[in-house]
Amino acid sequence: MDSNTVSSFQVDCFLWHVRKRFADQELGDAPFLDRLRRDQKSLRGRGSTLGLDIETATRAGKQIVERILEEESDEALKMPASRYLTDMTLEEMSRDWFMLMPKQKVAGSLCIKMDQAIMDKTIILKANFSVIFDRLETLILLRAFTEEGAIVGEISPLPSLPGHTGEDVKNAIGVLIGGLEWNDNTVRVSETIQRFAWRSSDEDGRLPLPPNQKRKMARTIESEV
């Protein structure tokens, strides 16, 4: 059995115990108590699957947490603040652009747009977004630029459907890339997108997609809204 699986279960058991003590003092609100009940059922199921006693695991989890807290400084207990990363200038973000062959698709709370008239170009993706815990938190805007600076694609959040995950953004990037590469464009991404929004690119920043995936993604973006 993986040691991380065991220690994770042990810590979860102890933290549940702490939350239970908090609830016993009638300090928890309704959502807190609801999560407590659901997590209790989950821990019982995990304990049965792992063949571990919950009481024993709780004691072991307490030792792990105490050891961590002994090494923790007050500074480390502060909640990390979001960082705002910018590939684009204000002018690049606010510039109007037009499509000769407009295509767009709504994927969850994100809108993907591209000009399918663009062919045989080298295209760079740039984005402005916030990051927390070294992961993308909120996409502000992503745009695709030709080497000449023309905007040929875009991914933006829909104001009417707030909320998206890093995985949502990654999937949307895949759809945009697939559509652009279908027309024999070479697509590269900025370093910030590579690091926080698309972790599978190669050293040149190109987003390698096999031909069958390109075709699938190109078909996906065919539906106009």
UniProtKB/Swiss-Prot annotation:
SUPFAM superfamilies: Ns1 effector domain-like, S15/NS1 RNA-binding domain. The gene is NS. Homodimer. Interacts with host TRIM25 (via coiled coil); this interaction specifically inhibits TRIM25 multimerization and TRIM25-mediated RIGI CARD ubiquitination. Interacts with human EIF2AK2/PKR, CPSF4, IVNS1ABP and PABPN1. GO terms for cellular component: host cell cytoplasm; host cell nucleus. Residues 1-73 are annotated as: RNA-binding and homodimerization. It holds the Pfam family Flu_NS1. The keyword Ubl conjugation applies. This is Non-structural protein 1. Residues 218-225 are annotated as: PABPN1-binding. A motif (Nuclear localization signal) lies at residues 34-38. Residues 204-225 are annotated as: Disordered. The dsRNA-binding region is required for suppression of RNA silencing. It is found in: Host nucleus; Host cytoplasm. Inhibits post-transcriptional processing of cellular pre-mRNA, by binding and inhibiting two cellular proteins that are required for the 3'-end processing of cellular pre-mRNAs: the 30 kDa cleavage and polyadenylation specificity factor/CPSF4 and the poly(A)-binding protein 2/PABPN1. In turn, unprocessed 3' end pre-mRNAs accumulate in the host nucleus and are no longer exported to the cytoplasm. Cellular protein synthesis is thereby shut off very early after virus infection. Its main location: host cell. One of its GO terms (molecular function) is RNA binding. InterPro entries: NS1, NS1A, NS1A_effect_dom-like_sf, uS15_NS1_RNA-bd_sf. Belongs to the influenza A viruses NS1 family. It comes from Influenza A virus (strain A/Hong Kong/212/2003 H5N1 genotype Z+). It comes from the Viruses. Upon interferon induction, ISGylated via host HERC5; this results in the impairment of NS1 interaction with RNA targets due to its inability to form homodimers and to interact with host EIF2AK2/PKR. Residues 175-210 are annotated as: CPSF4-binding.
